[in-house]
Design a protein with these regions (language model features):
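Hot-dog-fold acyl-thioester-processing enzymes
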Residues: 1-55, 102
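HotDog/MaoC-like acyl-thioester-processing domains
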Residues: 2, 61-106
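Small beta-barrel nucleic-acid-binding modules, principally OB-folds
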Residues: 51-65
Protein backbone atom coordinates (compact mmCIF):
# COMPACT_ATOMS: atom_id res chain seq x y z
CA UNK A 1 0.00 0.00 0.00
CA UNK A 2 1.23 3.49 -0.84
CA UNK A 3 0.26 6.55 1.21
CA UNK A 4 0.82 10.28 0.93
CA UNK A 5 -0.22 13.30 2.95
CA UNK A 6 -1.96 16.38 1.61
CA UNK A 7 -4.03 19.30 2.85
CA UNK A 8 -7.31 20.59 1.41
CA UNK A 9 -6.51 23.84 -0.39
CA UNK A 10 -8.79 26.80 -1.00
CA UNK A 11 -8.88 26.11 -4.75
CA UNK A 12 -10.28 22.63 -3.99
CA UNK A 13 -13.53 24.18 -2.68
CA UNK A 14 -16.73 25.21 -4.44
CA UNK A 15 -18.67 28.41 -3.69
CA UNK A 16 -20.39 26.69 -0.73
CA UNK A 17 -17.09 25.59 0.83
CA UNK A 18 -17.45 21.93 -0.17
CA UNK A 19 -14.55 20.01 -1.68
CA UNK A 20 -15.18 19.65 -5.41
CA UNK A 21 -15.42 16.15 -6.86
CA UNK A 22 -12.62 16.91 -9.38
CA UNK A 23 -10.37 17.83 -6.43
CA UNK A 24 -11.09 14.47 -4.78
CA UNK A 25 -10.25 12.69 -8.04
CA UNK A 26 -7.02 14.72 -8.22
CA UNK A 27 -6.03 13.48 -4.75
CA UNK A 28 -6.61 9.91 -5.93
CA UNK A 29 -4.77 10.37 -9.24
CA UNK A 30 -1.82 11.95 -7.43
CA UNK A 31 -1.63 8.91 -5.15
CA UNK A 32 -1.52 6.56 -8.14
CA UNK A 33 1.14 8.60 -9.97
CA UNK A 34 3.28 8.95 -6.83
CA UNK A 35 2.95 5.20 -6.20
CA UNK A 36 4.12 4.45 -9.75
CA UNK A 37 7.08 6.82 -9.32
CA UNK A 38 8.01 5.16 -6.02
CA UNK A 39 8.38 1.81 -7.80
CA UNK A 40 10.43 3.22 -10.70
CA UNK A 41 7.77 4.37 -13.16
CA UNK A 42 7.82 8.15 -12.88
CA UNK A 43 6.61 10.34 -15.75
CA UNK A 44 10.05 10.40 -17.44
CA UNK A 45 10.38 6.60 -17.32
CA UNK A 46 6.84 6.14 -18.65
CA UNK A 47 7.63 8.49 -21.56
CA UNK A 48 10.85 6.57 -22.33
CA UNK A 49 8.80 3.37 -22.53
CA UNK A 50 6.00 5.01 -24.54
CA UNK A 51 3.53 4.09 -21.81
CA UNK A 52 0.78 5.97 -20.03
CA UNK A 53 -1.86 5.37 -17.39
CA UNK A 54 -5.52 5.61 -18.39
CA UNK A 55 -8.40 5.61 -15.93
CA UNK A 56 -11.45 4.14 -17.65
CA UNK A 57 -13.92 4.39 -14.78
CA UNK A 58 -14.24 5.58 -11.18
CA UNK A 59 -16.42 4.18 -8.41
CA UNK A 60 -16.27 6.67 -5.53
CA UNK A 61 -18.10 6.51 -2.19
CA UNK A 62 -17.99 9.65 -0.07
CA UNK A 63 -18.27 9.85 3.70
CA UNK A 64 -18.57 13.06 5.66
CA UNK A 65 -17.81 16.42 4.15
CA UNK A 66 -14.08 17.10 3.81
CA UNK A 67 -13.16 20.52 5.23
CA UNK A 68 -10.88 23.33 4.09
CA UNK A 69 -7.31 23.04 5.39
CA UNK A 70 -7.99 19.50 6.66
CA UNK A 71 -4.98 17.19 6.73
CA UNK A 72 -5.61 14.07 4.65
CA UNK A 73 -3.88 10.75 4.15
CA UNK A 74 -4.50 9.18 0.76
CA UNK A 75 -3.89 5.43 0.40
CA UNK A 76 -3.75 3.39 -2.79
CA UNK A 77 -3.02 -0.17 -3.84
CA UNK A 78 -3.20 -2.05 -7.17
CA UNK A 79 -5.12 -5.32 -7.46
CA UNK A 80 -6.77 -7.71 -9.96
CA UNK A 81 -4.49 -7.41 -12.97
CA UNK A 82 -5.48 -8.94 -16.30
CA UNK A 83 -2.46 -8.45 -18.55
CA UNK A 84 -1.93 -4.70 -18.84
CA UNK A 85 -5.32 -3.86 -17.30
CA UNK A 86 -5.79 -3.68 -13.57
CA UNK A 87 -7.80 -2.17 -10.79
CA UNK A 88 -6.66 0.22 -8.09
CA UNK A 89 -8.21 0.85 -4.69
CA UNK A 90 -8.07 4.12 -2.77
CA UNK A 91 -9.01 5.57 0.60
CA UNK A 92 -8.89 9.12 1.90
CA UNK A 93 -8.52 9.33 5.68
CA UNK A 94 -8.75 12.19 8.16
CA UNK A 95 -5.90 12.86 10.59
CA UNK A 96 -7.90 10.78 13.12
CA UNK A 97 -8.14 7.81 10.72
CA UNK A 98 -11.78 8.37 9.75
CA UNK A 99 -12.54 7.11 6.23
CA UNK A 100 -13.71 10.14 4.24
CA UNK A 101 -13.80 8.52 0.80
CA UNK A 102 -13.25 5.11 -0.78
CA UNK A 103 -12.78 4.48 -4.46
CA UNK A 104 -11.84 1.98 -7.12
CA UNK A 105 -10.60 2.71 -10.62
CA UNK A 106 -10.06 0.54 -13.66
Amino acid sequence: MYTYQTVVRYEDLDAQGRVKIPAILNYLENAAVLNAAAVGYDMDRMAELDLCWVVMCWDVKLGRRIRWNEALTVETWPYQFYGSIGKRGFRILSAQGEVLAEADSW
